[in-house]
Amino acid sequence: LNLVDQLGEADEELAGTYAELGDWCAQRILQHVQR
């Protein structure tokens, strides 16, 4: 059960990291398009 809980927490952290990366990429693309 501990391993499952740890994996669940890790997945949430990864999801948040990927969400931030997605926002960063989107901003870079928008800036490039505006130029």
From Swiss-Prot:
Pathway: Amino-sugar metabolism; N-acetylneuraminate degradation
Enzyme Commission number(s) from the entry: 5.1.3.8
One GO molecular-function entry: N-acylglucosamine 2-epimerase activity
Domain of life: Eukaryota
Region of interest (Leucine-zipper), ranges: 1-21
Keyword Isomerase among UniProt keywords: yes
GO biological process: N-acetylneuraminate catabolic process
Catalytic activity: an N-acyl-D-glucosamine = an N-acyl-D-mannosamine
UniProt keyword terms in alphabetical order: Isomerase
Subunit and interaction comment: Homodimer. Forms a heterodimer with renin and inhibits its activity.
Function: Catalyzes the interconversion of N-acetylglucosamine to N-acetylmannosamine. Involved in the N-glycolylneuraminic acid (Neu5Gc) degradation pathway.
Similarity comment text for this entry: Belongs to the N-acylglucosamine 2-epimerase family.
Protein name as it appears in the record: N-acylglucosamine 2-epimerase
Taxonomic source organism: Canis lupus familiaris (Dog)
